């Protein structure tokens, strides 16, 4: 029994020494694994290398694995490039829709949208194309470097070079197409802009002609001033000013259906007194005549949308005044700014009440409607003269302010149009 135990110990010691000693003339090499093998958890066994040199099969396997890694990297890069091309193509499609009028709207630009301005669209496309070119050049340089450093067999290098060449040509064709589309978009945008500018210039010229009163009226006084909106910027202005007056008569034709109140048909302001002469109806108040900021209420009713002839007389002596509508005297009074002469050198405005000389209009007091035949005399007209003017028996222009085309300017969208004849206005009463 003791002999058997001794023999077993000796065999165990010999086996341990045999395991510790390396195999003479042998060593191991580590081989790169493909991703599939790593994921499967089945690594290839280490291959013993005899004499310190790789066999042709082992060299080919290592080259194939390195080529596979390179191809995987290039696929990822090409995928990013394709995504960039798809993104740029989508932007071009939206841009074409914008240039063709398919993407009209008033919405704000949001994240990812093309800018509304065609100039910004072209600029953004230029930047995108330049970025794509830079990335393509970087990709080409990287691919060539990888191929030159791979040490692959000549057949593999030729195949890879051909595929890279095809890919490069495809990308260059796509870039050329994008550049052509960008150029076409730029040309269409420029043509559309020129057409728009031409239309706007023609419209501006027409508006200027209307503002200057260049429309062909039958006679210098055969026009009306239209003030269609209650704003603080539509008005007419009489070029001439008033001299110092101790009496006056102001007559005009007007038509308005504004409510509440027709607003201010005319106002005359001088330095230090914005309400030197004002005719106004605002809110639910009756029509008022202001002279030197003193007020008289007039029994006139003209907000029915029909033409009406209005005349107002005033004299500084006792501040006497009269009010006529359609040739009929409807009211009279006194003590309206008595012994106060009308100051000269002021500004006469149609359609707005002035808070300062020539300005600071209030939209709530603006006149809405049409005005014509605004005349001023430096005396009190007789009742029969006013009747004759109202029933079209006579045409008597004012000796201080006559109603003539070249003496009236319009601003802010107010316009001058041919007016109905006096007889047509009478039929409208």
UniProtKB/Swiss-Prot annotation:
Positions binding Ca(2+) 2 in this chain are: 353, 355, 365
InterPro entries under this entry?
A: ConA-like_dom_sf, Neuronal_Pentraxin_Related, Pentaxin_CS, Pentraxin-related
Q: Which cofactors are reported in the record for this sequence?
A: Ca(2+)
Sorted alphabetically, which PROSITE patterns does this protein's record hold? PTX_1 (PS00289), PTX_2 (PS51828)
Cofactor comment: Binds 2 calcium ions per subunit.
Entries under SMART domains matching the protein: PTX
Q: Which residues form the Pentraxin (PTX) domain?
A: 221-422
Query: Glycosylation annotated at which residues?
Result: 146, 187, 391
Disulfide pattern: 251-311
Q: Which GO terms describe its cellular component?
A: extracellular region; glutamatergic synapse; presynapse; synapse
**Positions with a binding annotation for Ca(2+) 1:** 275, 353-355
Where does it reside?
Secreted
Leader sequence range is: 1-14
Chief location of this protein within or outside the cell: secreted
Gene Ontology BP terms: associative learning
Q: Which UniProt keywords apply?
A: Calcium, Disulfide bond, Glycoprotein, Lectin, Metal-binding, Secreted, Signal
Q: How does it assemble?
A: Homooligomer or heterooligomer (probably pentamer) with neuronal pentraxin receptor (NPTXR).
Name the UniProt record assigns to this protein: Neuronal pentraxin-2
Q: What is the native source organism of this protein? A: Mus musculus (Mouse)
